[in-house]
Amino acid sequence: MDGLVAQCSARLLQQEKEIKSLTAEIDRLKNCGHLEDSPSLDQLREENLKLKYRLNILQRSLQAEKRRRPTKNMININSRLQDVFGCAIKAAYPDLDNPPLVVTPSQQPKFGDYQCNSAMGISQMLKAKEQKVNPRGIAENITKHLPNNEYIDRVEIAGPGFINVHLRKDFVSEQLTNLLVNGIQLPALGENKKVIVDFSSPNIAKEMHVGHLRSTIIGESMSRLFEFAGYDVLRLNHVGDWGTQFGMLIAHLQDQFPDYLTVSPPIGDLQAFYKESKKRFDTEEEFKKRAYQCVVSLQSKDPDFIKAWNLICDVSRAEFNKIYDALDITLIERGESFYQDRMKDIVKEFEDKGYVQVDDGRKIVFVPGCSIPLTIVKSDGGFTYDTSDLAAIKQRLFEEKANKIIYVVDNGQAVHFQTIFAAAQMIGWYDPKVTQVTHVGFGVVLGEDKKKFKTRSGETVRLVDLLGEGLKRSMDKLKEKERDKVLTEEELTAAQTSIAYGCIKYADLSHNRLNDYIFSFDKMLDDRGNTAAYLLYAFTRIRSIARLANVDEEMLQKAARETKIVLDHEKEWKLGRCILRFPEILQKMLDDLFLHTLCDYIYELATTFTEFYDSCYCVEKDRQTGKVLKVNMWRMLLCEAVAAVMAKGFDILGIKPVQRM
């Protein structure tokens, strides 16, 4: 097979060279000006047309050959069916520009496995050209032009022109075997492409609170998704580590720990330390003046003040890392301070191109289509968030050479980022058709009273307290089910952590990120419905089926290579198709950046598995002795495929399942 592809490729290259040579010769003859009726020119034209025709056939053959080559990757069936129907529509209606191509999974078994719903749209296009054609007739014409393929068993036309597609059972069985033998692999969709994901971004000297939870969880999951798709992902933590607040913190540090340069100050509670310094800043005029002097010294890079700044950042960083480690978050810190030296050049570039206006001492930039201007220099000469965000986006585009930049920041910052992106386009830093820069917004976390999530005293909920409460609640739930009497201490702790952090993450990710969501430990720890608790329990049950039947990993691998997966029962067929939709789900998320789609899919997979398991015996036992009489190996393989897909889905969501719960 490889030899044939290589041979086709070589012929293709040779014919492309011949076409270039002939085209050059035709151009030369045209330029002579007196060879309009030259037989030489006519002969060359004819030869060129023949070569182009043969080249077109070769290109199509090569593409088809590559499609037929065995691959270790999971196939996106929806995408393959779109290719097939795209060819059919082009052949049936060659004169239509960009006809609609709509292929979706069927919602009910009676409508087949997939549906092509293009006929109605094509009917409208033909009507606009004053050609009246019934959509059903269009559907019939499309089906007549379907090319030979390995995916479709048969098609049916239903209603006004829906084309119901039934997949070949052998094809589905082969794809499931491929998944089991080679693991879950995607084609290298992001090969040689770089994605930057900017998320979490807490402020130094302030504790992380529930408001940071969504950005951190969504950003981590999004990073994992792009990494799995083969992208080079840079995860950035744009912490607030610069600004006037450091003046008051350093001044307070000098007063509280005068020997801080030689003895590391024991700042136990940085939040309390911040509040004390803020109180002094607001009430003591002398302290306020000294705080401003400290800012000037810090900005001029005085070594003693840089050391004080580093000490404060280190204390904060240690607290942040406790939360990141608990939630298995990976980030590279690159705060506002990183961009300070670039800001003067940013201002100069906007000035040189005539975009800067002065308003009450401020330097502002109006951006077309945006109602609020950017302030790039304050009236006191200082820079702003606008300046640092412009410096950041330029660095990411020109130095990091990112193909995609994703900012995971709450919906309240939507206008700010729209303006930053528009300014970057206006000044010529990037073309949105080439580089994708996206604000991934999200709603706020609400309490059960449907107001912003607060403590009983009305304060913002500290993230460390929230995680601690989650651990306590999950242990209570496990003990309520008497799992402490079955699991070892190590297994119990692993289950506690898996449930606590998994439920917190899943409760966030399972909602459409644009919406606010209600935080409720009771709901997220419920082991019924679309919750992490239910899915984690389902996963451990699936994993236990082989174990209880005394089927080990080696036996499963041998069976995957040698046993054909039979899909004769309707529940086997439904489960097999559901498993193979995984690449489609991932592609949709890569396109629209909505992660709840994956949560919905994993839940659908788990419930489809339950239907299968209730109807199809995987293991047959003696009812009296419990002795295993028969193991239906192809069904065990279906169990294994479900577990493999769920495990990868959990990994993308940042959830760690356990083998026993």
Curated annotation (Swiss-Prot):
Please give the chief subcellular localization of this protein: cytoplasm
> Where, by residue number, is the motif 'HIGH' region?
202-213
Chain spans, region Interaction with tRNA: 530-544
Localization, per the record, is: Cytoplasm; Cytoplasm, Cytosol
* GO annotation, biological process: arginyl-tRNA aminoacylation
Q: Name one Pfam family in it.
A: tRNA-synt_1d
Entry keywords, A to Z: Acetylation, Aminoacyl-tRNA synthetase, ATP-binding, Cytoplasm, Ligase, Nucleotide-binding, Protein biosynthesis
Question: Which residues participate in L-arginine binding?
Answer: S201, P202, N203, H212, Y385, D389, Q413
Output the InterPro entries linked to this UniProt entry.
aa-tRNA-synth_I_CS, Arg-tRNA-ligase, Arg-tRNA-synth_N, Arg-tRNA-synth_N_sf, ArgRS_core, DALR_anticod-bd, Rossmann-like_a/b/a_fold, tRNAsynth_Ia_anticodon-bd
Which CDD domains does the UniProt entry name for this protein? ArgRS_core
Report which reactions are catalysed by this protein: tRNA(Arg) + L-arginine + ATP = L-arginyl-tRNA(Arg) + AMP + diphosphate
Instruction: State the superkingdom.
Output: Eukaryota
Q: What is its EC number?
A: 6.1.1.19
Q: What general EC class does the enzyme of this chain belong to?
A: ligase
Q: Name one GO molecular function term.
A: arginine-tRNA ligase activity
Domain text from the record? The alpha-helical N-terminus (residues 1-72) mediates interaction with AIMP1 and thereby contributes to the assembly of the multisynthetase complex.
Assigned protein family: Belongs to the class-I aminoacyl-tRNA synthetase family.
Q: What is the role of the protein in this entry?
A: Forms part of a macromolecular complex that catalyzes the attachment of specific amino acids to cognate tRNAs during protein synthesis. Modulates the secretion of AIMP1 and may be involved in generation of the inflammatory cytokine EMAP2 from AIMP1.
- What assembly does the database describe for this protein? Interacts (via N-terminus) with AIMP1 (via N-terminus); this stimulates its catalytic activity. Interacts (via N-terminus) with LARS2 (via C-terminus). Monomer. Part of a multisubunit complex that groups tRNA ligases for Arg (RARS1), Asp (DARS1), Gln (QARS1), Ile (IARS1), Leu (LARS1), Lys (KARS1), Met (MARS1) the bifunctional ligase for Glu and Pro (EPRS1) and the auxiliary subunits AIMP1/p43, AIMP2/p38 and EEF1E1/p18. Interacts with QARS1. Part of a complex composed of RARS1, QARS1 and AIMP1.
Q: How is this protein named in the record?
A: Arginine--tRNA ligase, cytoplasmic
Q: Give the organism, scientific name.
A: Cricetulus griseus (Chinese hamster)
